[in-house]
Amino acid sequence: MVGFGLIIGFLKLINSVHTLFKPYINTDLLNSLTNVNLTTYIPNFLMLFYMEVLVNAFMVLMSAYLIYLYFTKSKKFPKYYIFITLFVLLAIPMDAYIASTIIPTAEVIDKDMVKSVFQSLFSGAIWIPYMLKSLRVRNTFIED
């Protein structure tokens, strides 16, 4: 169940990263939002954009690493899984807050954001205790 969730989560993450950044690739959109001389300029948008790139790159790399740890039955898997789950729980509202301070007119707390937070909370409430307490987890993830 965990392995299936990791793979589906990774594919969903790749899709959402592609959807998020596609409008900025090979277009003048980023320039129009970061050029001080244009009326579409948004102060600090470039910083927000780079932060989004870094966080999303981190998430993609960590998700791929988690899949590797899972299939190699590494002892590190439960700890990294818990770390990433907690990171996502903190990153979603933090990202929304930072975006709302940079773009005050943007509606950052929307249906999708609330859904993501509740999905992460629900997933964390189930899988974090399982990773910490399960004898099966301790017996499966034994490789160094």
Tell where the protein language model's regions lie, with residue ranges:
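Topology signature of small-to-medium multi-pass alpha-helical membrane proteins
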Residues: 2-144
